Amino acid sequence: MTSNHYLGAAAAGFIVLLAACAAQTQQSADGVTIGDSDLGGVVTSATGPEAGVWVIAETTDLPTKYAKMVVTDERGRYVVPGLPRASYNVWVRGYGLVDSPKVRTAPGKLLNLTAVPAPNDAAAAQYYPAIYWYSMLQIPPAGEFGGYTRIPKDRTQADWLKQVKNIGCIGCHQLGQSSTRTIPSAFADIKSSEEAWVRRLQSGQSGEQMTNQLAGNFGGAPYKYYADWTDRIAKGELPFAKPPRPQGVERNLVVTSWEWSTEKHYLHDLIASDRRNPTVNSYGPLFGSPEYSTDNMPILDPRTHKVTTFKMPVADPSMPEALGPGHAASLRPLAPSAYWGEEKLWDTRANNHNAMFDKQGRVWMAATVRDRPNPAFCKKGSEHPSAKVFPLEMSSRQVAMLDPKTMKYTFIDTCFGTHHPQFGYDADNTLWLSGTGPVAGWVNTKVFEQTGDAARSQGWAPFVLDTNGNGRLDEFIDPKSPIDPSKDKQIIPGSGPYAVMPSPVDGSIWYTVGVFGGPPGFLRFDPKTRLSEVYHVPAPYFGIRGGDIDKDGVAWGSASSGHLASFDRRKCKGPLNGPKATGDHCPEGWSFYQYPGPGFRGLGENSAESSYYTWVDQHNTLGLGENVPMSTANLNDGFVALKDGKMILLRIPYPLGFYAKGFDGRIDDPGAGWKGRGLWSTNGDRTPWLMEGGKGAKPRAVQIQLRPDPLAR
């Protein structure tokens, strides 16, 4: 072949390559560039470009319902990147708008969309996050506490706020979305709204727990306030505040969601990776924790969009269900549901509350393996080293491990209860648990792998303050005895450990404590000395729920007062042990950052946000940087991050009513930029049918990613 032939062939190949590139990308006159798997265009209304609104693309063509959501830039431009090949419904949603008509299309097209301004404030308010409606709830003024009204004498205004926020009602549900700010039609014939609320909260397998909280703990007084709230809304009262549209970096979010589990079963959490090593399980499946709802663990493969289930076993198949006394759900509905009648929905034995990956890619769960009474090695008279110090009679949940490679499920019978698991940073890969009651509890997973002996692999120890100040664990007095400066003192930290957080700095173990009773705060346990320190939330702040720790050893938590709380032990000025170091000795270690959103009126500056859990992005899995604390924003339809002193909202705009109890971060490909990393979570409301979509709606797993700009592909 001559050189001219070579040149001719090369030129032809170059032309083909150019044609292929042209087919792969398109650019609009507005500067929107898309590829074959993208959608892009401009959103406008009669008033011009619509900035900071969402474009939502959803399909049912894949193995499970799938949606991807983005935010428009300052010129109304958008790009929905990386859509699987399918046919999509696409529409616009935003504050000040009503949903636009859905347009049917496929990826690879430039698609301009027309937004629809809301005809009035009432129509616009239907799309507001729940907090804008829930903040309309009236709170009894301070003068109504102290035994002068129906409110029991021993209940304070802070107790009331904890109940109507993240320690009580918002601990299981988002209140303020459409389903909860109205009365179900099934109860419409009840003669008074207050009686309708009494009946409503008796419904289903949580009816007993809800009734005990409001009628038992608060004398039934809250019913009146909830009735007044829904009455005012039914008469046309609207939120007194309006939500701002996403601004700045909030417009760079890409949210992807998949339906999973069933319309009758909720999920408490999901797990994606090892929080210490977030490249573990890269591009791998997500595992859901269905808690009280079912033994069927949903597993989502985000690459194929397929959802499968694994039925979690228990060691004794004849054991009773993990429902009823000792649990936060009942065997049967207290009264028929407005949605499901007398049907019993929940039937779990495994009761998988929460899970964590280890560095080998195995899933370790806080899950029930047998009935509540403990085996003999846990009890008084046992030769187990921990039982000699502090015997334990029963536990309602233990530990299990699933190996996704083989799907082998292993039981680890613990004497202490479990709730949230977290791996430490030690050579033994110690698994630390919360929900352990009066003790710190752990499993040495290295020993368990070597021996398979659950008894030998576990340990526990009571929480003991070094009140004699000598730095050693000595003879200690019981929790009810007054301080003796010559001895140490055991404490029961209120309702016990709730969140658990091993420190990457010094190996100490931190917990949130006093969540459901007793003084709330953080507790530090030293595995080497077996000594504890406790730090109470200082007034005027109150309450705490989930928490985490950052790479500097600073503890962070979701405070009931509507704040992200932090505690830095390094700021303490006085002694950390001794007879005065009993919880109130270091207020200077605390800092508080108010969550976004309106507050309840009559209480001064506050936020009604009722965050369930806080997590620290130690490894920049989202893209805001390392060591960024984030909280579930349970009334703001998503999450909130604290970056450089500013709160950044990470909203899930669809379906309305997104409510999470936790989240995780994963780096699938460190070299793939924003596409290779993201946060993962799932809708965790106990009643999926209360979110947008109503009866038949399923929980959604979500991935949140952060682009460098709203048009990045």
Where are these regions (language model features)?
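Short, acidic Ser/Thr/Gly-rich low-complexity loop/linker segments typical of extracellular
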Residues: 33, 60-82
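Short, ordered, surface-exposed loop/turn motifs in non-cytosolic proteins
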Residues: 45-61, 85, 134-146
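Short Pro-Gly-centered beta-turn/loop motif in secreted/extracellular proteins
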Residues: 49-50, 79-87, 95
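A short, solvent-exposed loop/turn motif at the edges and junctions
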Residues: 59-65, 87, 91-108
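The canonical Cys-X-X-Cys-His
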Residues: 166-177
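Short, conserved, GDST-rich strand-edge loop motifs in beta-rich repeat architectures
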Residues: 179-186, 281, 288-292, 322-323, ...
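Structural signature of eukaryotic scaffold interfaces centered on beta-propeller domains
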Residues: 259-282, 342-360, 420-428, 489-506, ...
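Surface loop/turn motifs at the tips and blade-to-blade linkers of beta-strand repeat domains
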Residues: 268-270, 310-314, 343-348, 411-416, ...
